[in-house]
Regions:
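A short beta-strand motif characteristic of beta-propeller blades
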Residues: 24-32, 71-77, 112-118
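Blade-loop segments of beta-propeller domains
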Residues: 32-39, 59-103
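Short, contiguous, helix-prone interaction/anchoring segments in small proteins
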Residues: 27-54
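Short, solvent-exposed coil/turn segments
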Residues: 19-21, 36, 153-156
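Asp-box/WD-like beta-propeller blade repeats and closely related beta-sheet repeat scaffolds
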Residues: 80-89, 93-165
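Blade/loop signatures of beta-propeller domains
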Residues: 1-24
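Short acidic/glycine-enriched loop/turn segments that link adjacent beta-strands
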Residues: 20, 58-59
């Protein structure tokens, strides 16, 4: 699958049996999907688009989901996409995201992309956060030699490396 490819999602609704609340499912439950990190601006100002991550045939990629018609457009390709790192700019024209140790700005219409920052060698960059006026971005940089292996061998102990004491 490649950047710009279009998929379709069929929305469905059901009533939660415990609360009586109507729940609207936006994505196919057979495809692993999730939204961006909670403080990232993941919807456009007009509420038409939502940034999501999905795991399809070739791993996890970022997509825009049109909340009016269910169209899903793939916006990244390749390995190392920061699966919860994307955010819309304050004017909805740019999508910022992380891939490997690089941070990118992408034109939301044309998908033209340019790298604006790369973490130094020996460091890992993550958790980008943008100011509301898009003037400042914070990035967590951690020395790679202080991180546990990310190959799954540590299991849940991977997270213990970040606990105090």
């Amino acid at each position: 699958m490649s950047k710009g490819q279009i998929f379709h999602s069929t929305f469905s609704e059901y009533t939660d049996p415990y609360t009586g609340t109507v729940v609207k499912r936006l994505t196919d439950p057979s495809i692993l999907s999730h939204h961006m990190y909670f403080y990232n601006r993941m919807t456009t100002s007009d509420g038409q688009y939502l940034l999501i991550c999905q795991k399809r045939d070739e791993g996890r990629q970022l997509y825009t989901l049109n909340l009016h018609n269910g169209e899903i457009r793939q916006i990244t390709e390749g390995d190392g996409v920061g699966q919860d790192s994307a955010m819309f700019s304050h004017d909805d024209k740019t999508i910022f995201y992380q891939q490997n140790n690089r941070f990118y700005a992408m034109d939301a219409q044309t998908l033209e992309t340019h790298c604006f920052y790369e973490t130094p060698e020996g460091w890992s960059g993550s958790a980008p956060g943008m100011s509301s006026d898009n003037r400042f971005m914070s990035i967590v940089e951690t020395r790679q030699d202080t991180l546990p292996p990310r190959d799954g061998s540590a299991g849940w102990n991977f997270f213990c490396a970040y606990l105090p004491g």
